[in-house]
Amino acid sequence: MSYYSGYSGGLGYGYGSSFGGLGCGCNSIRRLGCGSGYGGFGYGSGYGGFGGFGYGSGYGGYGYGSGYGGFGGFGYGSGYGGFGYGSGYGGFGGFGYGSGYGGYGYGSGFGGYGYGSGFRGYGCGCRRSSCCGGYGFSSFY
């Protein structure tokens, strides 16, 4: 967390922004301080929240604890355009809890659905590559 402003650029504002957003707890790519990435704002975004807003937006999306980006997405932990809770890489058009890349569910990785899926897979707490297509518990990368 640590309310720390990383780059404070773009059109973001607030505390703990990564590239120009505001929020707390960024995790992916630019791990500096906390918050959204690219112009977005929220809580625990991954790479960027390009115009996004909410809790942990990614790249233009908004949500809670997104992984890489939530390009136009919204919700809890959106990825790349999706919305959900705790997404891994991207939720391009996805929705739900932790959608990945167009997927939906809780903590999905890349287009998966369910509870913490990785890459189109399903399980619990999967984050990204390590859960490619499968399922597991608390796997990060």
Swiss-Prot record:
Region of interest (48 X 2 AA repeats of G-[YCGS]), residue spans: 5-135
Give the domain of life.
Eukaryota
Tissues/organs with expression:
Strong expression in narrowly defined pattern restricted to the lower and middle cortical regions of the hair shaft in both developing and cycling hair. During hair follicle regression (catagen), expression levels decrease until expression is no longer detectable in follicles at resting stage (telogen).
Keywords, A to Z, come to: Keratin, Repeat
**Statement: the UniProt record of this protein carries the keyword Transit peptide:** no
Which InterPro entries does the entry mention? KRTAP_type_19
Copy out the induction comment.
Expression in skin and hair follicle is regulated by HOXC13 and by GATA3.
Q: Which GO terms describe its cellular component?
A: intermediate filament
* Quaternary structure annotation from Swiss-Prot or TrEMBL: Interacts with hair keratins.
What function does this protein fulfil? Answer: In the hair cortex, hair keratin intermediate filaments are embedded in an interfilamentous matrix, consisting of hair keratin-associated proteins (KRTAP), which are essential for the formation of a rigid and resistant hair shaft through their extensive disulfide bond cross-linking with abundant cysteine residues of hair keratins. The matrix proteins include the high-sulfur and high-glycine-tyrosine keratins.
Which family is this protein grouped under?
Answer: Belongs to the KRTAP type 19 family.
From the Swiss-Prot or TrEMBL record, give the protein name: Keratin-associated protein 19-2
In its UniProt entry, the species of origin is given as Mus musculus
Give me the gene this protein comes from.
Answer: Krtap19-2
